[in-house]
Structures are given as C-alpha cells and as structure tokens.
Amino acid sequence: MDIQVMEEFQGIFATILPNEFTMSRLPAALAHECNHNIRFQHIKWRNDITLAEMMITEGLAENFAVLQYGIENMGPWVSKVSMEELEDYIKPIIKEGLFLKGLDNITAYLYGDDIAREKGYFPVGLPFCAGYACGYYMVKYYLEKTGEDIASATVKPAEEIMGKIEDFWS
C-alpha cells in the first residue's frame, strides 16, 4: 500500500499468529495500537520523525497497554530487557542517536540490529527492539516524575516530554 493511501486510511495494520500466547495478549496489543491511533490524531506523522519521538510514541503505547491490562501482559519487546542491560548497554548507545531523523536512520536503534540488517540498514550494536524497551522506561520515568496521566501525555508533543526527562539519561 503506498504512503498516500496509508495517510488517507489512517489505520494500523497488524499480523497476528493465533495461538494461546498471542490470543491471551491480544487486548494489550490492541490497546497499544489504539494509543498510536489516538496520538496520531493529535500529533501529525512525519517521515522525518526522530528516534526520540518514535521512542516516546512506542513508550506511551506500551505504558498505556500495561496500565490497562497489567505488567503480566507487557510486550516481550520490553519484558525481555533487564534493567542492567538497559542502563549499562542500551541507553548509552541510544542516547547518541536520539535526534537522528527518518526511519532509515533510526531503525537499528528502535528495532535492533537483526531487523536493521534485514531491511538493509546499518547495525548500531543493539538487541531486538531496544528502542521500544528504552522508550517504555523513558515514558514511565516521565509519568512518575511529573505525575501526569497517560491520556494527557499521549497527546503531548515529544519535545515537551523530552524537556522534562533530561536526567533519565544520566
């Protein structure tokens, strides 16, 4: 489907492999995707989106899903990353790429090296969906620090969120 049709459709496409594991997590996955739909009704999608903006978008969606359906239904792109791995390994690499623009430049940071290589992009030394995991914890940090609720944060520009969490990176 070309970009113009996608913009007119304003939807989200997903593939689900039906089995006991995926079906039990379907409500949380749908909540995650619905959060994206809500956000992009208020924040215009741009093809030159920064890594920071994408991480906030994914972090908002996963925090919303966890708030609705519990931590036990957190996506494996977050739950499989330990805090030690996040702090010692992932955050320092991602911090260097926060303001890169465009999916071709941010794919490895967001999805990890394996997917980047598969798509023909350069690897940066990150595991599967490292940017999703970091985005989840970045937004969680923001919500806890500010006391803001997920609904109002979902429609807030990424720059405003980033401006309040500079200490997340130290």
What residue ranges belong to the model's regions?
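Active-site scaffold of zinc-dependent metalloenzymes
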Residues: 1-23
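Secondary-structure boundary elements
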Residues: 19-23, 27, 31, 66-74, ...
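An acidic intrinsically disordered interaction segment
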Residues: 20-34, 86-110
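Short, conserved micro-motifs enriched in small and acidic residues
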Residues: 24-25, 29, 51-55, 125-133
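Active-site recognition of the HExxH zinc-binding catalytic motif
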Residues: 28-41, 58, 62
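Inter-helical turn/loop segments and adjacent helix faces that build the functional surface
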Residues: 41-51, 71-80, 145-152
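Post-HExxH zinc-binding segment in Zn-dependent metallohydrolases
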Residues: 51-98, 166-169
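Pan-zinc metallopeptidase signature
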Residues: 95-170
